[in-house]
Each structure stands twice: as structure tokens, then as C-alpha cells.
């Protein structure tokens, strides 16, 4: 929910017309019906989808998608972690081969294993970014910096939400926005 809200806020700050929907509310179908009724279509959708919703999704065709982490919190619904992982990975399904960018949490090996060979990947994590297109953290003196490659973006203390988990959320949102062409400055 935090990352979806951050993506929506960042896109709006970049003057994009964006519709934020899904688990975050409103429901995707309600938001879609509103757009149909008003004939007002956004430039972008920022959607939060659950593994439950993805089970019946043939393909999302997202320009960019992410799985933030995998944990055992839904094993009451799934027979195994593998089944849960397969459901979550459906967010990356696309009709066109090679289409859609994957934003992957490099601190979660199970998420990294979702990398598709025909897709571009951008990673985020709580360490120094391994390449110029990846996002991460630099700890320097008493400061913690959010980074894109070797470029310092902002101090984590400047985030409205605090904690390393929220720094990771911000990095994921930054990676998603960058991947669709939003300037980060």
C-alpha cells in the first residue's frame, strides 16, 4: 500500500494524471467504471494487486511491476511457498515478449529468482546499488542516502515516513517511476 501511494504521489508531482486503485482503494473495477462513466482516462494506473487477484489474471500488461517481498503470511491459502510465489509472479505476465520492466528487491532471493530473461530489470535494496540503473542506500557518517546508481537522491531522514523498510518502499517507488520516464531530481 505504501509503495502504491508513493508511486501515485510521485507521478502526480511530475504532473502525470494517475489513477491509484486496488487493495489501496478504490477497487480497480470501481476506478475503471468511474473512468468509463466520466470518459476521463489517466496517463497511468498505480495498482496494488494481491496474489489472490493475480490468480485469475491472464496478463496484466503492466509497463512496470514489482514484487516487494515474499513471506509466509498467506500460506493459509496456498499449499506451499512455491504456489504462493507463482501466484505473485503473475504480476509480470505480459502479452508481448520482452515487454514490461521488472522492479525486483535484490535483498529477497526469492523475488530475484522471478527475473525473466526477456525483460529489463531494475533492482532496489538496502545496500549500495550495483549498477547505474539500480536503487539503494548509502550510509555515510551520520547520514543515510537514497541512491540511484552512484547519484545521491535524498537523505532518508527527509522522507515523511521513517524506518529502513520505508526507505526500501521509497526506493521501489522511485525505481518504478524512473522506469516509465519520470525525472528524479
Each language-model region and where it sits:
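Phosphate-binding loop of NTP-binding sites
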Residues: 2-106, 110-120, 138
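Adenine nucleotide phosphate-binding catalytic loops in nucleotide-utilizing enzymes
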Residues: 80-82, 120-185
Amino acid at each position: 500500500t505504501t509503495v502504491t501511494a508513493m508511486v501515485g504521489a510521485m507521478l502526480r508531482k511530475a504532473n502525470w494524471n494517475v489513477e491509484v486503485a486496488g487493495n489501496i482503494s478504490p477497487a480497480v473495477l470501481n476506478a475503471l467504471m468511474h473512468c468509463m462513466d466520466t470518459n476521463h482516462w489517466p496517463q497511468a494506473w498505480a495498482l496494488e494487486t494481491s496474489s489472490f487477484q493475480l490468480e485469475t489474471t491472464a496478463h496484466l500488461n503492466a509497463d512496470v511491476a514489482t514484487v516487494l517481498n515474499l513471506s509466509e503470511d498467506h500460506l493459509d491459502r496456498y499449499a506451499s511457498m512455491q504456489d504462493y510465489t507463482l501466484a505473485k509472479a503473475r504480476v509480470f505476465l505480459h502479452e508481448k515478449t520482452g515487454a514490461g520492466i521488472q522492479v525486483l528487491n535484490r535483498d529477497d532471493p526469492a523475488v530475484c529468482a522471478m527475473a525473466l530473461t526477456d525483460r529489463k530489470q531494475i533492482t532496489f535494496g538496502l545496500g549500495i546499488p550495483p549498477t547505474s540503473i539500480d536503487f539503494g542506500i548509502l550510509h555515510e557518517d551520520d547520514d543515510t542516502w537514497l541512491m540511484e546508481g552512484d547519484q545521491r537522491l535524498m537523505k532518508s531522514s527527509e522522507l515523511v515516513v521513517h524506518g529502513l523498510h520505508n526507505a526500501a518502499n521509497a526506493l521501489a517507488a522511485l525505481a518504478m517511476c524512473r522506469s516509465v520516464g519520470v525525472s528524479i531530481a
